[in-house]
Amino acid sequence: MDFGIVTAKIDEIGYITHAENLGYSHCWVTDSQMIRSNCWAVLALAAQQTRRMRLGTGVNVPGLRLAPVAANGIATINRLAPGRCFIGLGTGHT
């Protein structure tokens, strides 16, 4: 069984590293622009501070972010955490 964590703020990065140390396998970072931290910045910091945890958005809202910007964001995270990233797409704000 896998366990994951959801976070939204860059100052909660300690939760992500603690969750990895406890054996959590995934981290989803919400993409709520203007409300929470930039998801790509949080994921980049998490990529630097974790070694095994899979990292991605939960969820990226296509109607609020241009596709090339989202593609560049996840590609950058993949460079920092090769093979450990994913992108969740959806309507968000639920």
Language model segments and positions:
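Generic, well-ordered alpha-helical segments
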Residues: 34-38, 62-69
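Short glycine-rich, polar/acidic loop-and-turn segments at beta strand-coil junctions
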Residues: 31-33, 59-63, 91-93
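Flexible, glycine-rich active-site loops centered on histidine and acidic residues
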Residues: 1-5, 64-94
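N-terminal beta1-alpha1-beta2 module of alpha/beta enzyme domains
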Residues: 1-58
